[in-house]
Swiss-Prot record:
Protein name: Pentamidine resistance factor, mitochondrial
Domain of life: Eukaryota
Keywords: Antibiotic resistance, Membrane, Mitochondrion, Mitochondrion inner membrane, Transit peptide, Transmembrane, Transmembrane helix
Subcellular location as annotated: Mitochondrion inner membrane
Predominant localisation class: mitochondrion
Annotated organism of origin: Saccharomyces cerevisiae (strain ATCC 204508 / S288c)
Role of this protein: Probably involved in mitochondrial export. Confers resistance to the anti-pneumocystis carinii drug pentamidine. May act by the removal of pentamidine, or its damage targets, from the matrix by an active-transport mechanism.
Subunit structure: Interacts with COX18. This interaction may be essential for its insertion into mitochondrial inner membrane.
Note: Present with 1460 molecules/cell in log phase SD medium.
One Gene Ontology cellular component: mitochondrion
Transmembrane segments: 199-219
GO biological process: one example: protein insertion into mitochondrial inner membrane from matrix
Length: 423
């Protein structure tokens, strides 16, 4: 007799996700949003700037050791370019004559850029080299993400079977569940393919030197991700969101659809036209496949292969969210501080498309109010997806709540792009 047990995922249509403004107010009152917001207000969750998580020593007040496995600043671009600071230093430098200050200022800006490019190239090489062993163990291209999703699902099922470990609906306390991979390793495995941009990037920098910044500002996709300046990053973020929020139906995954009851509609990847799949994949910041392959898939109408790539993004965001939430909610509010870097916060907002066309995410994260707005958007996004799930504070698995590979969750949801009026 075959002793194997088949695991069947049960789908329960969500009954609280509405299509009007009531949704936003309902999310703010949810236990998960309150728990996340409380940790931020109490200082348990901090947004940290200018910290080298790869350094051998860290500041005495650094929220280590958890942050070192949470952030990968070396694989992300700067959030602030010190242009005005450099010009101000030249202005106050008495050794530089007045007639030379203008040229000297811009010369030093150029040198700073070249130095940042050098650091970016070195970090790209380090990320690729340091993750070589993990890449063999967790091959993203060969189903590693699906295996990690199944691992999380087994955690959820085991929690359900062990009813004593289920949290109350008002606590939003995440039961401790170590995963076989930490977040830093996960995101660096996704970002390691930036190394293939180095030959063209290095050639352009070698030929044009300081002028290359203009090329990378107008053509940011040529530049390795961690070498982008805030100007190039803004142009890139605008290009990503432009197609997503377009009124034309062949952009992104299409408009967010609702059932007659006002709940978010379940939609599998195979229900989406090939053109929409292609446009979404080419606009995702950390693509796991080259654009020329995607173009071939589209031309040959290989919808299954395009759907596979969509599912990888769906799985990656689910795992990334799960690791972040576990880190934030598993800590003792009074004893442990969780540090999420400003670069990681901006990248989370970019990948989940929680911003408007024209938003300067780097400028926002360097402003107190702007940073809070970005965090609230992320909290609302997490609350919509994970409130009332077993991993946090509920009774349903994630698949039961939303269905398997519900790509409606990848669509742009304007209600989650909250403003400063969300407290």
């Amino acid at each position: 007799m075959d002793s194997r047990v088949a695991l069947v995922r049960k789908y329960i249509a969500p009954s609280v996700i509405k299509s009007d403004s009531i949704q936003l107010h309902g999310l703010v009152k949810a236990p998960l949003f309150k728990a996340l917001n409380s940790r931020y207000k109490l200082g348990s969750l901090q947004i940290v700037q200018d910290v080298d998580w790869n350094a051998k020593t860290t500041p005495s007040d650094s929220p280590e050791p958890l942050a070192a496995t949470l952030n990968s600043n070396r694989s992300l671009p700067m959030t602030k370019f010190p242009k005005q600071e450099i010009l101000e230093q030249v202005k106050l430098d008495t050794k530089v004559g007045k007639w030379r200050k203008f040229m000297t200022g811009w010369f030093r800006i150029g040198l700073y850029l070249l130095k940042s490019y050098k650091t970016g190239i070195q970090n790209t090489l380090k990320v690729f080299w340091d993750t070589r062993n993990e890449e063999q163990k967790f091959s993203i291209k060969n189903g590693a993400l699906a295996n990690l999703v199944r691992e999380i699902e087994m955690h959820e099922i085991n929690t359900r079977l062990s009813s004593s470990s289920l949290p109350t609906s008002s606590s939003a306390k995440a039961p401790l569940r170590p995963l076989s991979i930490n977040r830093k390793t996960l995101v660096e495995l996704i970002r390691r393919d930036q190394i293939w941009k180095l030959p063209v990037f290095f050639t352009l920098v070698f030929i044009f030197e300081e002028v290359s910044v203009l090329i990378f500002t107008f053509f940011p996709r040529v530049c390795p991700y961690n070498c982008l300046t805030p100007g190039g990053y803004k142009k890139l973020s605008n290009s990503y969101i432009k197609g997503t929020t377009s009124t034309q139906g062949n952009y992104g995954l299409g408009p967010l659809e609702f059932t007659k009851q006002g709940t978010i509609k379940y939609e599998p990847p195979y229900a989406v036209p090939i053109e929409n799949l292609y446009n979404f994949l080419t606009s995702f910041p950390q693509s796991m496949i080259s654009n020329w392959k995607l173009y071939i898939y589209k031309k040959l109408k290989l919808q299954k292969l395009l759907c596979n790539e969509i599912e990888k993004i769906y799985q990656y965001l689910f795992i990334d969210d799960w690791l972040l939430l576990q880190s934030i909610l598993n800590t003792d509010v009074e004893k442990t501080k969780i540090a999420l870097s400003d670069r990681e916060l901006v990248n989370c907002i970019l990948e989940r498309k929680l911003y408007h066309m024209g938003d300067d995410l780097n400028e926002m994260v360097n402003d107190t109010l702007g940073k809070e707005i970005l965090l609230k958007r992320l909290f609302l996004y997490w609350t919509l997806r994970y409130n009332d799930t077993i991993s946090l504070n509920g009774k349903h698995t994630f698949s039961e709540k939303w269905g398997v590979n519900n790509i409606s969750l990848l669509k742009y949801n304007s209600e989650l792009v909250a403003t400063k009026d969300i407290q």
